[in-house]
Amino acid sequence: MTAIIMIAQLLVGLGILVFVHEGGHFLAAKAFQIRVPKFYLFFNPSISLVCFKKVGGKWRVKFFAKNLPDTEPVVDENGEPVLDEKGKQKFKLINLDKLPEDDWRKHPENTEYGIGWLPLGGYCQIAGMIDETQSVENLATEPQPWEYRSKPAWQRLIVVLAGVIVNLIVGVLLFAFVLGHYEKEYLPLEAVTDGVYAFEQARNLGFQTGDKIISVDGKTFERYQDAVSAKMYFGSIVTIERDGIQKDIVIGDEYNLLKSSNGMFLQPYNFPALVDSVFPAGEAQKAGIQKGDVIIGLDTIVIESYGALIEYREQFANRSVEVSYLHGNDTLSSLITFDSTAMLGVAIASMPYQTKTYTIGQSLHYGWSDAMKNLWLNLKGFEKLFSGEEKLTSLSGPVGIAQIYGGVWNWAKFWYITALLSVILAFMNVLPIPGLDGGHALFTFIELITGKKVPDSVLQYAQTIGMILLLLLMFFVIGNDIFKLFK
């Protein structure tokens, strides 16, 4: 059941992102009177699960329909195939006038919508655009007024970048939705009156438990999560207040620290480990620990805060440990056996800090902020990838993304991950690689700057090379996903 939920979340999330991305291209193309022959959610090699199109004024639907060719072999007067100079069969565009009236190909002015069976993306076929959806024969004809290639460069640029823009907008709106609808509240930085809990890796850089974050690189923040974010690891100057005195702590490029810390760097956990509830039949309940007790020791380690409990309990996995705790005015202790996860069997009371409720305006503001922060982190990740600090095997494909969604359908997590993927998809597609939106935009920018259109032959070669590279990358990440499953 877990695997089914993971797959379902992947398909729904990917379906949403593909639909809005290709929908951006679709709307932009239609705005400039460019024909869109096909609009598909997921790829449809050879066959489509379902497709529909307006033919003769009525909507027609097909299930499990085979893809029909838009070309036919060229033959001589004797019916023999005509070959080109390389000895390959020549093809020509099908004569639409000879097709029966109910043949969908006879109505190219209307869009065919459909759902394919290969959930690795989707496509919006734009008439006259040099990409993987166009046949050589189509591009060999004279440009038509309703084709992409006949439009001015600025219109073509908007069309190719529309998908990226929509993905970015959707990412911002989804982040805002998660903040306003699910999280609802945030922790103000100024509310962390007892300072942060500094885990070992933070202490090694000069932080101490109780430090109050004042600013990062001279910038102050309203939300705690913005001050203590992943951006801190890539080189920053953190101004803290300690014992009433402000001082700067310089953090270099600590990318490896970011990967290894697993979020345990600086956290607002500098408050007592007050037991809020005890799990039934758990070790803590058997030992007599009750709601309202405060954990103050593990073996010989003094536990002064919730952060310390989190940091030190892991070393006691599968061990029996003397746990000390305050029960009213009494200090008690019990021998407790930790399980493999080193969980004590209690829930600690939430942070004793005052939170604030997101307004609609704040949700949108921080939705944009979170989108930009994740975009920046992706840029830094690619920088590490190309510098060799990060390995290609760290890339994740569909299996890895499904695992990120997880085997439990949590709507807040689902929308957050979908928002994150929408921003990542925007970033990936805007890269200036032939075959991606950024590749098309690059050639259009060159045309705008030079005043000369890049020859179709160059575009076709670039598109072919780009698609080969992208397919190789896709096979690599999928293979890498499978390898990780059995590792």
Describe each region flagged by the PLM.
Residues A3-L139, M428-T450:
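Small-residue-rich helix-interface/hinge motifs
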Residues Q9-G13, F19-V20, A31, G122, ...:
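Internal alpha-helical transmembrane segments
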Residues H21, I115, A202, G210-I213, ...:
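Terminal peptide-recognition signature
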Residues M129-V136, T193-E254:
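Juxtamembrane extramembrane loops of integral membrane proteins
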Residues T141-W154, N262-K286, V294-G297, I301-F427, ...:
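Functional transmembrane alpha-helices
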Residues V159-V192, A227-S277, Q285, E322-S324, ...:
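PDZ/PDZ-like peptide-tail recognition elements
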Residues V178-E222, S261-G297, I301-E304:
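PDZ/PDZ-like domain segments forming the peptide/carboxylate-binding groove
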Residues Y461-D481:
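Final/C-terminal transmembrane alpha-helix of multipass membrane proteins
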